[in-house]
């Protein structure tokens, strides 16, 4: 069964065709990074206008690469939230238009669930119950999954998301946008020599990164940072220490079979290394191209929703503030 996935929640316009929820036939992403980097962050109005220009060519390329016509598509899965309203509207309306014109079922997908399904596209099928650490630009969530479509939120950030913290720290250090990859690169030539705080929040699986960011800012303002690479490595280590330790504690408490990693920050090299080295349980870490925003993960998640009866009407709307549990 082939699913067409469409994703436009932030600054990537993406379309993909996935067979049976696990085989990627095509996965096209048109990135707007070059456009937004001159502003140091995503400009929502610019993003939605760019999605409008890219959406139809990207969908058409994805179908062509998969050698698939609309008549072979069993359902269209599209991200309807969370994300930027103007960006989401473009993908959702493209999906609705095709669904209406071709009589194809429409399946709305929560972007955060989509990120988790990168783990179903990585060659091995995860075992339930599993604990997923989703770390992206807008979210840092620890989610327990006991089956497809069953999400229980065990912990979340109380302030900045991990990706947001990376992006803000990069700005403080004068590194390029997007900040996460820039800090990752700079860290490779640095030593984690700065003493930065870690927020453990005892008795809770929640996270907090705003104090760490402020501590870095103070050190920079006081002239106590002599090497950008060392500061980047110190900041990255502080974030990763907390993410890994809290994830392993939570996995132990809930007695899961496996840990899954998801979201853009899952592309971080130190996080990938530390989590797999320190975990006594199997850890699923998707390839980097499936961690950042793409439509194959939306198609995969949409497939598992669709085969268990999930389908949406054409009056389905965007939900910019959707959480991992609704
Ligand atoms: O999941 P994503 O592509 O978009 C959202 O849904 O937010 O995540 C984007 C976030 C950005 O904050 C970016 O800086 C971060 O993921 N990121 C990284 C790395 N690659 C992307 N953070 C740390 N290390 C990386 N290598
Ligand atoms: Zn994302």
From Swiss-Prot:
GO cellular component: cytoplasm
Enzyme class: transferase
Any one Gene Ontology molecular-function term assigned to this protein's record: iron ion binding
Record's subcellular location: Cytoplasm
Function: Required for the formation of a threonylcarbamoyl group on adenosine at position 37 (t(6)A37) in tRNAs that read codons beginning with adenine. Is involved in the transfer of the threonylcarbamoyl moiety of threonylcarbamoyl-AMP (TC-AMP) to the N6 group of A37, together with TsaE and TsaB. TsaD likely plays a direct catalytic role in this reaction.
Organism: Dehalococcoides mccartyi (strain ATCC BAA-2266 / KCTC 15142 / 195)
Binding of substrate, residues: 134-138, 167, 180, 184, 268
Top-level taxonomic group: Bacteria
Protein name: tRNA N6-adenosine threonylcarbamoyltransferase
SUPFAM superfamilies cross-referenced by the UniProt entry: Actin-like ATPase domain
């Amino acid at each position: 069964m082939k699913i067409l996935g469409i994703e436009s929640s932030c600054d990537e316009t993406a379309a993909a065709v996935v067979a049976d929820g696990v085989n990627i036939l095509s996965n096209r992403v048109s990135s707007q990074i070059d456009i937004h980097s001159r502003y140091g962050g995503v400009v929502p109005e610019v993003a939605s206008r760019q999605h409008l220009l890219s959406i139809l060519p990207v969908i058409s390329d994805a179908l062509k690469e998969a050698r698939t016509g609309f008549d072979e598509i069993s359902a269209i899965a599209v991200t309807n939230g969370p994300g930027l309203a103007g960006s989401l509207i473009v993908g959702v309306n493209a999906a609705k238009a095709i669904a209406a014109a071709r009589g194809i079922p429409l399946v709305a997908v929560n972007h955060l669930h989509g990120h988790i399904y990168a783990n179903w596209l990585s060659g091995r099928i995860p075992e339930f119950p599993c604990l997923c650490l989703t770390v992206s630009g807008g979210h840092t969530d620890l989610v327990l999954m006991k089956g497809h479509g069953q999400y229980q939120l065990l912990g979340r950030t109380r302030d900045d998301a991990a990706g947001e913290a990376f992006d803000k720290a990069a700005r403080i250090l004068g590194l390029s946008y997007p900040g996460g990859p820039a800090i990752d690169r700079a860290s490779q030539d640095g030593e984690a020599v700065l003493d930065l705080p870690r927020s453990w929040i005892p008795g809770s699986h929640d996270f907090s990164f705003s104090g760490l960011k402020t501590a870095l800012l103070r050190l920079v303002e006081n002239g106590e940072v002599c090497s950008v690479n060392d500061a980047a490595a110190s900041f990255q280590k502080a974030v990763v220490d907390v993410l890994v330790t809290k994830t392993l504690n939570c996995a132990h408490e809930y007695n899961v079979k496996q840990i899954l990693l998801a979201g853009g920050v899952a592309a971080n090299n130190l996080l990938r290394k530390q989590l797999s080295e320190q975990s006594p349980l199997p850890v699923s870490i998707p390839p980097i191209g499936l961690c950042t925003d793409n439509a194959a993960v939306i198609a995969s998640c949409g497939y598992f929703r669709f085969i268990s009866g999930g389908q949406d009407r054409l009056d389905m709307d965007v939900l910019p503030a959707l959480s991992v549990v609704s």
